[in-house]
Every structure is written in structure tokens, then in C-alpha cells.
Amino acid sequence: MTDPIADYLTRLRNAIMAGHRVVSVPASNIKKEITKILFDKGYILNYKFEENDSQGIIKVALKYDLAHKVNAIKKLKRVSRPGLRKYVGYRDMPRVLNGLGIAIVSTPRGVMTDKEARELKVGGEVLCYVY
């Protein structure tokens, strides 16, 4: 697989469209960090890391509003990809939906949201947009 982050986002997107409550994805350090950000910002209900004999599995519980039949994540968009990396400085950090969404950025200080990167004045690679 050439782009594990795109695979992770696609698995989440497919589970949302199918109406699944829980989705299992192969674990990696960057996927764990992205999942933690999604949980902290309220886009997913819960997550659990399960150790197995190889790399482990992340089980993500998706968040839905059952009364209106909508989910918390409207769109997951991969920005920087292996064929075309997108790096930005903290001054040029993108604002997703004028601040209503988040951009997940990989910086020298770790994976964080666009707002945190602006506050710490650190740039990096824009991994994806979530709104």
C-alpha cells in the first residue's frame, strides 16, 4: 500500500456511508495520532487500540445523530499525498470552512490541528481536512 493515511480515511468514509457503528483499521503511529485528534475534537465517539501479533488494530466508534440521521463527519479529504506533498508555514496554514472544520498537520512537534500549529508558530505537512 502506497498511502496508508488515504486508506485509513477511505475506510472511515466507507463505514460512514454504510452506516456502520464501528470500523477496524490496521494501526500505525500516525493513524493513532489522527484518531486521537478526531476524538479530542468530537468527530468520533470513541476509539480503542487492540494489540495483536503484528501491528495492532484501531477500533473506531463513529458518532451519529440518530434523530436527524447524520454523522459528525461530513467530509474527510486527503490533501498531501505521496505523489504531491503539501507543506505550509504557520502563516499560510489553511482555514477549513472558515474555522468550522479542522486541518490535520504533521509538524516537527508531532501531529496536530491547524489551530494548534498556528498558536505554536510551526508549519508542516497538511495531511487532511475534516469537517
UniProtKB/Swiss-Prot annotation:
Pfam annotation, one family: Ribosomal_S8
GO biological process, one term: translation
Cellular-component GO terms for this entry: ribonucleoprotein complex; ribosome
Known function: One of the primary rRNA binding proteins, it binds directly to 16S rRNA central domain where it helps coordinate assembly of the platform of the 30S subunit.
Domain of life: Bacteria
Full protein name: Small ribosomal subunit protein uS8
Quaternary structure (record): Part of the 30S ribosomal subunit. Contacts proteins S5 and S12.
Gene3D superfamilies: 3.30.1370.30, 3.30.1490.10
UniProt-listed HAMAP family: Ribosomal_uS8_B
Keywords of the record: Ribonucleoprotein, Ribosomal protein, RNA-binding, rRNA-binding
Ribonucleoprotein found in the keyword field: yes
GO MF annotations, alphabetized: rRNA binding; structural constituent of ribosome
Family label: Belongs to the universal ribosomal protein uS8 family.
